[in-house]
């Protein structure tokens, strides 16, 4: 799913949610939804991914390397949802899924002829993710409620280039570790429609470990620590 398709889907579902919410004064949709302990559903998401970068303390940009710039790239997520409701307005959510992420680093160099040249090094990943989130929700008002999220995620990069042979690949690769752990936080809104609950949520993930593999090349030498950062906008469908 590209960004344009996601926006069309978002607008369509927002109109559907608004229609359902407008009827809140007439009737309350799925009134027994919160009385059930377990709920299941799925999420469709768009993401934007980049890095937190720390440079080596003894490194200074020289006449050749002028700078390194983060270039966030777009991607998407597909996930299943299992939710346990132990007490009112508190949910424990397990959201396993796939996250297709793309990150970019722009390296700017000054060549011998005083010409500025930029090289974009991209790191593409397909993460198998296992997030566990705590959802804290407000009381339901008609067919609407707001909520906050906090939790963590363990991920395995199914497309990791950690062990790639650069001699065979024919290029220098910025290699990343195969696993990552993130701290996630965000919030959203629930709309209770006639047959299911629809949610819109925004979430940010902060990597907790250094994922950069030091290969001793010109692209990794200036960097001491590199952690992932991801922003996710999701549409949640829950029954």
PLM regions: where:
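Predominantly the C-terminal beta-signal and adjacent terminal strand-loop region
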Residues: 180-185, 189-239
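Extracellular/periplasm-exposed beta-strand and loop segments of Gram-negative cell-envelope proteins
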Residues: 50-73, 101-127, 155-180, 210-230
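Bacterial Sec-dependent N-terminal signal peptides
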Residues: 1-27, 237-239
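Short glycine/proline- and aromatic-enriched beta-strand/turn motifs that initiate or cap beta-hairpins
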Residues: 22-74, 238
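Gram-negative (and chloroplast) outer-membrane scaffold detector with strong preference
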Residues: 34-38, 46, 50-52, 81-162, ...
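Short, well-ordered amphipathic alpha-helices
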Residues: 22-25, 80, 131-136, 187-188
């Amino acid at each position: 799913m590209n960004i344009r398709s996601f926006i069309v889907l978002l607008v369509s579902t927002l109109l559907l949610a608004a229609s359902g919410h407008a009827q809140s004064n007439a009737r309350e949709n799925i009134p027994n939804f919160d009385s059930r302990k377990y709920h299941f559903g799925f999420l469709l998401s768009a993401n934007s991914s980049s890095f937190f970068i720390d440079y080596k303390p003894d490194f200074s940009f020289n006449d050749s390397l002028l700078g390194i710039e983060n270039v966030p790239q777009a991607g998407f997520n597909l996930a299943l949802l299992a939710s346990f409701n132990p007490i009112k307005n508190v949910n424990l959510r397990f959201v396993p899924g796939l996250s297709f992420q793309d990150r970019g680093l722009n390296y700017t160099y000054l060549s011998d002829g005083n010409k500025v040249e930029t090289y974009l090094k991209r790191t593409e990943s397909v993460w198998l993710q296992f997030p566990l989130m705590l959802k804290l929700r407000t009381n339901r008002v008609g067919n609407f409620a707001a909520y906050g999220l906090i939790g963590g995620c363990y991920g395995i990069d199914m497309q990791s280039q950690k062990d790639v042979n650069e001699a065979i690949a024919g290029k220098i690769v910025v290699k990343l570790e195969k696993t990552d752990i993130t701290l996630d936080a965000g919030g959203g809104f629930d709309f209770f429609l006639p047959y299911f609950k629809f949610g819109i949520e925004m979430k940010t993930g902060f990597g907790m470990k250094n994922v950069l593999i030091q290969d001793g090349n010109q692209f990794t030498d200036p960097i001491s620590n590199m952690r992932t950062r991801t922003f996710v906008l999701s549409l949640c469908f829950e029954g």
